[in-house]
Amino acid sequence: MKSALLKQHFLNPVGMKRIDSPSYRATCRSDTCSDVIRMTVTVDGDGVVRDIGTEVYGCGYSIAGASLFNSAALGIPVEDVAAIVDRQLAAVLPEVPEGNRRCVELPKKAFSTIYESYRSEKNR
């Protein structure tokens, strides 16, 4: 891995776990390889991500991307997670081989399902 940040997240991943009683959960499979991510998130009454866990069945780039995502999302309002993660991804994606970029972005795809569930529940 060329990115020092992604390498750090791969070697010392953050949030690689399953939350037993999450507020939301999503499973996402890559459309280009066999990587799978299962994400569980606990959101408090104010809409803040209080805990996030990700199980990754895939390559090192998926693991690093999930760890980066988890560390960026923790303690952030659900509504703001995508923008914050986008800024972090923009900084590292140029150093990721073209064929692995979707692996790094896979956690964001899983979180989009969680976000839609959150918005749907909030608008009831």
Question: What residues fall within each predicted segment?
Answer:
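Domain-level signature for proteins that mediate thiol-based redox and metal-cofactor handling
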Residues: 1-124
